[in-house]
């Protein structure tokens, strides 16, 4: 019975050896050793053989003896960990709990949530969407002051204006009623141009400008809701509503070419035409020198009853000249045209009558600069300290001529208008304007000083025919 069991075990071992050799291609002796080492476990023996890269066909006797002993000493060695594939992190659901709740509630929660972007968002509903020039034009059309806010994204106080001040309903109401609100970033092109012109240094920055002249009236840096309302209320109490152009847009009409927009060639042509006209009227001017000298002492200004004294004539002569001008306006207009050409070509100092006609015949070029004599300027700014600070003004006339005059800073703007009118450019037909910033001086109050009008210490003033 025992012999029958031993033969069955040996036949089973032979079968395992044959399977091992068929799988691995090794010899029967190698298969026998591997099966003995693995306790007749065919799978483990094949794995061990393949992992070891194969074993020699006939191992030495010493290795054989070691292998024969190994089953007794290493029977407790555990099997290798089988290979398997698993996912370390399970995929998250496509929507979170909050998103699923919002979908179920129809987005009601999203309306209640206020993000940081909403808190610090600029006041789009208040802002003027355009450039600085269009904001000024809009302020003139709507008779509203121009409020400027320069934003620096690196300054948190500027962001607080968006969060606390501009979002307040009381602030919004007062801005909508009285101001054109223009906000721009400091590093933008418009912001850099504004900073360079108005010399901005501190942030946050809020200022109020007159849209007609571009003059800065007030400037604030630290504001909250209460202080802003107090400051704006005080400003409106002091300056009131802006009195400017009517809210109705002006009718478009054919506009003549202005002196500023004209090229040098066109200005030179205008000067040559004026010179030819002067030569043509030389004979008429020589006959009427005495009379035109008397009438040039005074001029009517803008339809008012005032007289503009240039050379200090007495009141009786002024009343007599006024009566003459009222009786024959067409004749007086002809005299004015003839008189106006003569002072532009005369030298600053008064000359003899015989030499005055010679100067009248000189051609007038664009490069000619006429300086105003102290005697004439004293007559215009009578009653003002002429020894104080001066304003250097370069006047450019429509005929291409230029005149440089010096007036005290405290002289009224009316004095400048009178001087231009004495040169033959009445206020009814001509206006004064500056180029940068482009503004019309004829729209300002004539009682303000040259310093308040922004013409100090020096400025170029253009005389242009009204449209």
From Swiss-Prot:
Protein name: UBX domain-containing protein 7
Sequence segments annotated as region (Disordered): 57-77, 240-260, 281-364
InterPro entries on file: Thioredoxin-like_sf, UAS, UBA-like_sf, UBA_8, Ubiquitin-like_domsf, UBX_7/2, UBX_dom, UBX_domain-protein
Modified residues (N-acetylalanine): 2
PROSITE patterns: UBX
Any GO CC annotation of this UniProt entry: nucleus
Cross-link (Glycyl lysine isopeptide (Lys-Gly) (interchain with G-Cter in SUMO2)): 84, 112
Major place of residence: nucleus
Protein's organism: Mus musculus (Mouse)
UniProt domain UBA: residue ranges: 2-54
Location(s) in or outside the cell: Nucleus
Biased composition (Basic and acidic residues): 330-344
């Amino acid at each position: 019975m025992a012999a029958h069991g031993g033969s069955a075990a040996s036949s089973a071992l032979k079968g395992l050896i044959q399977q091992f050799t068929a799988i691995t291609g090794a010899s029967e002796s190698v298969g026998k050793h591997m099966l003995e080492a693995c306790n007749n476990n065919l799978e483990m023996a094949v794995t061990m053989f393949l992992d070891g890269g194969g074993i020699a066909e006939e191992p030495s006797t010493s290795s054989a003896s070691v292998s024969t002993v190994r089953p007794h000493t290493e029977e407790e060695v555990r099997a290798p960990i089988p290979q398997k594939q698993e996912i370390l992190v399970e995929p998250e659901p496509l929507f979170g709990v909050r998103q699923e709740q919002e979908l179920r509630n129809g987005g009601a929660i999203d309306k209640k949530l206020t993000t940081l972007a909403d808190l610090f968002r600029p006041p789009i509903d208040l802002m003027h969407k355009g450039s600085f020039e269009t904001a000024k034009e809009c302020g003139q059309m709507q008779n509203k002051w121009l409020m400027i806010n320069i934003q620096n994204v690196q300054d948190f106080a500027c962001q607080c204006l968006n969060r606390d001040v501009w979002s307040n309903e009381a602030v919004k109401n007062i801005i909508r009623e009285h101001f054109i609100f223009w906000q721009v970033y400091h590093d933008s092109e418009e912001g850099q141009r504004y900073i360079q012109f108005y010399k901005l240094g501190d942030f946050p920055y809020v200022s109020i400008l007159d849209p007609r002249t571009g003059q800065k009236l007030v400037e604030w840096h630290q504001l909250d809701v209460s202080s802003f309302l107090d400051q704006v209320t005080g400003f409106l109490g002091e300056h009131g509503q802006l009195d400017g152009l009517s809210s109705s847009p002006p009718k478009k009409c054919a506009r003549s070419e202005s002196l500023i927009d004209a090229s040098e060639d066109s200005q030179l042509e205008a000067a040559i035409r004026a010179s030819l006209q002067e030569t043509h009227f030389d004979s008429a001017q020589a006959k009427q020198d005495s009379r035109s000298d008397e009438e040039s002492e005074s001029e009517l200004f803008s339809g008012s009853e005032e007289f503009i004294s240039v050379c200090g004539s007495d009141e009786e002569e002024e009343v007599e000249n006024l009566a003459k001008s009222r009786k024959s306006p067409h004749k007086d207009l002809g005299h004015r045209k003839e008189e106006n050409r003569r002072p532009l070509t005369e030298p600053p100092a008064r000359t003899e009558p015989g030499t005055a006609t010679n100067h009248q015949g000189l051609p007038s070029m664009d490069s000619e600069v006429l300086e105003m004599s102290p005697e004439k300027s004293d007559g215009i700014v009578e009653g003002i300290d002429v020894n104080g600070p001066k304003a250097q003004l370069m006047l450019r006339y429509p005929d291409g001529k230029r005149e440089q005059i010096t007036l005290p800073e405290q002289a009224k703007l009316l004095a400048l208008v009178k001087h231009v009118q004495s040169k033959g450019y009445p206020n009814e037909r001509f206006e004064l304007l500056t180029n940068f910033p482009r503004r019309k001086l004829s729209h300002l109050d004539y009682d303000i000083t040259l310093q308040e009008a922004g013409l100090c210490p020096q400025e170029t003033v253009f005389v242009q025919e009204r449209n």
